[in-house]
Amino acid sequence: MRWILFVLLLVLAHDGEAQGGFAHAEGKFFVDGAGHKLILRGTNLGNWLVQEGYMFRLEGGPQSAREIEAMVNELIGPTDAAKFWHEYRDAYITRKDIDFIAKAGFNTIRIPFHYKFFVPGDEEGFALVDRVVEWAKADHLYVILDMHCAPGGQTGANIDDSWGYPWLYEDEASQQQAAEIWKRIAAHYHDNPTVVGYDLLNEPIPHYPKLQQYNSKLEPVYRKLVAAVRSEDKNHVVILGGAQWDTNFSVFGAPFDKNAMYTFHKYWMPPVQDAVKPYVEFRDKYNVPIWMGESGENTDEWIGQFRKLLDDNEISWTFWPYKKMEAKSAPVTFARPEHWDEIVAYAARHAGMGDTEKSVAARPSLEDSRAAFEDLLRKIRFENATVNDGYLKALGATVK
């Protein structure tokens, strides 16, 4: 009897330690490890581990990560391109960026990542994210890990680096690989309270009518991913986004995990109560926390109005993105590198391999291409970038 009592007390103590040390869902709100209500306020480290063409001002050119990588390979060769990308990932987000985010008054960063960095045998993803997590810990920031690009593609667009179709819902092998990667990540971070949770799939299933047939398959895929996470990690919150770019919560039944949070994204709509009403109603109906994982790409006035609306409704938020080229709609922006107009003009040709003679004639010189990407590595560093004070003020952040 004493032994049974001892084991029971040990189990209860362990559960209490997990709940006490980790931020978690508690009713319709998120709470910190001490049980105090926690409203997440932060930014997305977009364009770091998943590149998007518009954030490089590649109008009319490559938009997905693999298309951008192919362009760099074409212009400076595969060896120099591989070296460039390693240096890019080291330079785009540094300790100075994380320190700045904390000093501005934010408490959270969301890290969009490509699954390829976490496949067995490639440890670069863990090395890069571990470094940021350590900086975040020192600055008292929380980290959310976001699978922006899942095996097979969860969206079927440029943002998930897919083949233009959400094959994840058709392909069991892709689902299994996604589950295995989340299991690896959960095993790695299971005892790290700086990591607040796992955003399992970014913006699944677009609004295109032909693809909404996959809405009914989304929650079953989430169940597989949650099971994989829970096999290694009982501490962290799992985050589920709705269909149609994380906007449609009608695809969800009752919550199936006691430590879950639901996320929505909202862009380009009037910043009024009706914009968040469905999500607030979902929160109240199911007694679960909600989080606005992405919004932005708008004027400072709009950003300020929507941010206030979220705060008034006690909704956590992370605006998109933290940094991009020549833009006011981000906390930080960097200048266009030298020779970049030549790069943009070449990238917009879409010539492919069908007319290599014209492509070679149109391409910038190797010297100019190398100079452009070397200058890009300089421009993206925090010390060479520009802070957008108006955008920060709109987010209620501290401007120094």
Question: What do these predicted regions represent?
Answer:
Residues W3, A65-E69, A81, S369-F373, ...:
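Short amphipathic alpha-helical segments that mediate assembly, nucleic-acid/protein binding
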Residues H14-A18:
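Sec/Tat signal peptide C-region and signal peptidase I cleavage site
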Residues W302-K400:
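Aromatic-rich peripheral "rim/lid" segments of glycoside hydrolase catalytic domains that contact
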Residues W3-L12:
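Sec-dependent N-terminal signal peptides
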Residues F22-A23, Q176-M325, S329-A345:
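Extracellular glycoside hydrolase catalytic/binding regions
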Residues A25-L40, L45-V237, G242-S250:
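Active-site mouth of glycoside hydrolases
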